[in-house]
A protein has these predicted regions:
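Conserved beta-alpha-beta core of the PfkB/ribokinase-like small-molecule kinase fold
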Residues: 1-40, 58
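Conserved phosphate-binding/catalytic region of the ribokinase-like
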Residues: 35-153
Length: 153
């Protein structure tokens, strides 16, 4: 779709604060295979922050002065990855909607919520995993993930 709408896409990107895009789209948009270089080129297009999703390898948040890598949540069995990226973006947006300020730290927090939302998505076909999701399950898995992140950092 980028091939047919690149001019319009770049106009829209210029007006965004945060662009969430997958690694293949980032390469197509910037011509860069390296994720960090690609994200830096995206920042020059207008956004203050860029998140590049890396599928089962997690995601990376880049600003002009900072970088944050987040792994994916280690689910026991992936049933269907369809919709995981959209679930990530939706979970992130939902978390950011409850924040007073949108900044690097609040986006990092949102990425964790997005990662956990995506983890529920991939455990079932279609939206079935998300239909079973509630705030208690989400928060429980967020805490498990945070403890995992503390151990690996």
């Amino acid at each position: 779709w980028m091939d047919t709408a690149m001019v319009e896409l770049k106009k829209a990107i210029k007006k965004t604060d945060l662009l969430i895009i997958n690694d293949e789209e980032a390469e197509q948009l910037t011509g860069e295979k390296n994720i960090v270089k690609s994200a830096k080129k995206i920042l020059k297009m207008g956004p203050r922050y860029s998140i590049i999703k890396k599928g089962d390898k997690g995601s990376v948040l880049i600003s002009n002065s900072k970088k944050y890598n987040l792994p994916s949540y280690p689910v026991l069995k992936v049933i269907d990855p369809t919709g995981a990226g959209d679930s990530f973006a939706g979970g992130l947006a939902g978390c950011l909607a409850s924040e007073d300020k949108i900044n690097f730290e609040s986006i990092k927090k949102g990425m964790i919520c997005g990662t956990i939302t995506a983890s529920f998505c991939i455990e079932s076909f279609g939206v079935e995993g998300l239909k079973k999701l509630d705030k208690i399950k989400l928060n429980k898995r967020v805490e498990i993930f945070k403890s995992y992140l503390m151990k690996v950092s």
